[in-house]
């Protein structure tokens, strides 16, 4: 099975530490510094949104240039191959892939930037607020998604940075251990006076 990071909304305080850690570690590696996870907020909870590294990943299936592949028990994106078509972001069921525009493009001489006063008058279009439709002349859009910090032997930076342990890396072995522990809790449910295993505190889990 693929590895992935799971988020626990009940423990998340929305401090943005995970986003900062993700951005910093990728910038250090010379990759897009846009965070590989997002923070979704409602009136009651704050939850990190992270790539699930799906077994039958739709993003992998739609990429026209094979920039997305399955390797090392994860779904990985090769930024150097990405053409910025954004199909992967459109089909992701979790909204875990975003578009970043921080890599300059070497434009042909005839397309070099002109001063604003030299441009022909024309109808102005209001800038879009939709992240997938935004663009900037002279900058190439590149998709960014969680790579589980595969360049770090210690694993994802977001998991290690979270002060509340709201993020955890799930592997095949750890999933098996958790399943066995939850089976044990379920079996002892009646013996414990009917206490719901899902109501256990973080320490008890």
UniProtKB/Swiss-Prot annotation:
The residues that hold [4Fe-4S] cluster 3 are 51, 54, 59, 92
| Residue intervals of the 4Fe-4S ferredoxin-type domain | 2-31, 41-72, 73-102, 140-172
Q: Which cofactor does it need?
A: [4Fe-4S] cluster
- Which is one Pfam family of this protein? Fer4_4
Q: Which domain of life is it from?
A: Bacteria
Q: Which residues form the signal peptide?
A: none
| MF GO annotations | 4 iron, 4 sulfur cluster binding; metal ion binding; oxidoreductase activity
Per UniProt, [4Fe-4S] cluster 2 binds at 22, 146, 149, 158
InterPro entries xref list: 4Fe4S_Fe-S-bd, 4Fe4S_Fe_S_CS, RnfB_subfamily
Residues involved in [4Fe-4S] cluster 4 binding: 63, 82, 85, 88
Relate the induction remark in this record.
Answer: Most efficiently induced by formate during post-exponential growth at low external pH (pH 6.5) in the absence of respiratory electron acceptors O(2+), NO(3-) or trimethylamine-N-oxide, i.e. under anaerobic control. Transcription is activated by FhlA and HyfR, inhibited by HycA, part of the sigma-54 (rpoN) regulon. Subject to catabolite repression. First member of a 10 gene operon (hyfABCDEFGHIJ); it is not clear if the 2 following genes (hydR-focB) are also in the operon.
> Binding positions for [4Fe-4S] cluster 1?
12, 15, 18, 162
Record flagged with keyword Transcription: no
EC code(s) of this entry:
1.-.-.-
- Copy out the cofactor comment: Binds 4 [4Fe-4S] clusters.
- Keywords, comma-separated and alphabetical: 4Fe-4S, Electron transport, Iron, Iron-sulfur, Metal-binding, Oxidoreductase, Repeat, Transport
What functional role does this protein have?
Probable electron transfer protein for hydrogenase 4.
- Recorded protein name is Hydrogenase-4 component A
This chain's source organism reads Escherichia coli (strain K12)
Name of the gene encoding the protein in the UniProt record: hyfA
